[in-house]
Amino acid sequence: MESNDLNKESLENWNESWDLVMTFGMGHLTSKLFNILMNNSIFDMINESPKHYKEIAKIINFNEFSCYRLLRYFVPYGLFEENNEIFSITNKSKKLIKSGGIYNLCTFFSSNDYFKLYSTIPESFEQNKNLGPSSFGFDDFWDIVKTNEHFKYSFNQEMREFSNLSIPTIIKNTDFSSFNTVVDVGGSHGRIVGELVKKYENLNGIVFDLETVINSSIEKIKHPRIEYVSGSFFESVPSADCYVLKNILHDWDDEKCLEILKTISKSMKENSKIFIFDEIIDPNDYRKLSLFLDVTVFHFFNSRERSLNDWKQLCDKSDFKIDSINNVTQPQLLILSKK
């Protein structure tokens, strides 16, 4: 083998090895450094105009060289460009400014609270139970939200952005034109029905959620064709032509999901439909997001994301059958009707 070939092979091995080490062994370091950028709104700062690292250091009250080290760390990741010690953001990192759509997601996922929440994940897998809440001293995830105002605020902001990313694909790629009344089960601030009543002039929307959620939602969508109803989907839901459950059932195990579906079944009209927007894990085409969410809901709630076979088995145990599937929406859509 030629010397140049040996050198090339050696270099490739070096790069592949360190890519693995830095991605899987040191990802926590990148996340914590990234959190410094998010907490100091550095992407917004540089988005206004490229800045010398010394100017940035002065604004955020950092040591100049420490600031330079932090900024240059993310140049190979494509988040900054550097020219004569002046840093600018890239098309990629424009999504990380506060109005970019994922600012709160990135800030929460790289936060100390989130790291703390995952400190017990080895035990969750070892014991096959959700020990995420135990990292905060609780058995139930929602007790963290109820008692920790900082966590509650960050979590709600993150969830709002998570929802905002998916809603446009849902509205664009789902036909609600045949329905008079749509209930968004667990609908929180009413964003989905808010978009639906704008698109369909004859449609009425009901946002159904817990009383505490309805009363505390500061961004509640107001419209003459939108009604807010409080209650528990384990007890009763309003009567409607269509029930939307977006990222609801993945928070619950099969037994609880069957209870939710049974409750809805009691209020359904003859031709009512259930629109379930949730991940459908494809064993032949795994998606990073689906599997990230699967691990997350397991660690938080002892629940799961489901494959198509899992969804079919769930329906077999209930009053419902799957009429159709839409893989274009994010998350995917399963349309259910009574058997």
Curated annotation (Swiss-Prot):
<dbReference type="InterPro" id="IPR016461">
    <property type="entry name" value="COMT-like"/>
</dbReference>
<feature type="binding site">
    <location>
        <position position="209"/>
    </location>
    <ligand>
        <name>S-adenosyl-L-methionine</name>
    </ligand>
</feature>
<dbReference type="GO" id="GO:0009058">
    <property type="term" value="P:biosynthetic process"/>
</dbReference>
<protein>
    <recommendedName>
        <fullName>O-methyltransferase 7</fullName>
        <ecNumber>2.1.1.-</ecNumber>
    </recommendedName>
</protein>
<feature type="active site" description="Proton acceptor">
    <location>
        <position position="250"/>
    </location>
</feature>
<feature type="binding site">
    <location>
        <position position="232"/>
    </location>
    <ligand>
        <name>S-adenosyl-L-methionine</name>
    </ligand>
</feature>
<keyword id="KW-0808">Transferase</keyword>
<dbReference type="GO" id="GO:0106268">
    <property type="term" value="F:3,5-dichloro-THPH methyl transferase activity"/>
</dbReference>
<feature type="binding site">
    <location>
        <position position="186"/>
    </location>
    <ligand>
        <name>S-adenosyl-L-methionine</name>
    </ligand>
</feature>
<dbReference type="GO" id="GO:0008757">
    <property type="term" value="F:S-adenosylmethionine-dependent methyltransferase activity"/>
</dbReference>
<comment type="similarity">
    <text>Belongs to the class I-like SAM-binding methyltransferase superfamily. Cation-independent O-methyltransferase family. COMT subfamily.</text>
</comment>
<dbReference type="InterPro" id="IPR036390">
    <property type="entry name" value="WH_DNA-bd_sf"/>
</dbReference>
<dbReference type="InterPro" id="IPR001077">
    <property type="entry name" value="O_MeTrfase_dom"/>
</dbReference>
<dbReference type="InterPro" id="IPR029063">
    <property type="entry name" value="SAM-dependent_MTases_sf"/>
</dbReference>
<keyword id="KW-0489">Methyltransferase</keyword>
<dbReference type="GO" id="GO:0008171">
    <property type="term" value="F:O-methyltransferase activity"/>
</dbReference>
<keyword id="KW-0949">S-adenosyl-L-methionine</keyword>
<dbReference type="Pfam" id="PF00891">
    <property type="entry name" value="Methyltransf_2"/>
</dbReference>
<feature type="binding site">
    <location>
        <position position="233"/>
    </location>
    <ligand>
        <name>S-adenosyl-L-methionine</name>
    </ligand>
</feature>
<dbReference type="GO" id="GO:0032259">
    <property type="term" value="P:methylation"/>
</dbReference>
<feature type="binding site">
    <location>
        <position position="246"/>
    </location>
    <ligand>
        <name>S-adenosyl-L-methionine</name>
    </ligand>
</feature>
<dbReference type="InterPro" id="IPR036388">
    <property type="entry name" value="WH-like_DNA-bd_sf"/>
</dbReference>
